[in-house]
Amino acid sequence: MDYVLITFASTYGAIYAQKLLAPVAPVQVMPVLREVSLGCGMAVRLHPEDLPAVRAAMAGSQLKPEEYAFYAVTGTGETLQAHRIT
């Protein structure tokens, strides 16, 4: 896995997560890959090694689990693969 994306059902969720996660791990808000969109068009990108701390922070947040999803992303362009992490 090259990086992890968190996708969101709403723009509010993406902005909220960016603020929530800033003290936990370096994150970047970016346009979501259409292969993994939950609807709002924004995602938070993070390093795979930060996933456990980020998951813990998200689990303790006001966002409901159905409002966001984690994806493992590998490759770029035509070789890009994204798989949901459960």
Language-model segments: residues:
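Short glycine-/aliphatic-rich beta-strand segments at the starts of folded cytosolic domains
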Residues: 3-7
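C-terminal structural segments of small proteins and small subunits
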Residues: 52-86
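Short connector loops at helix/strand junctions that flank enzyme active sites
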Residues: 1, 37-41, 65
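Amphipathic, hydrophobic secondary-structure cores in small proteins
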Residues: 9-11, 19-22, 26-56
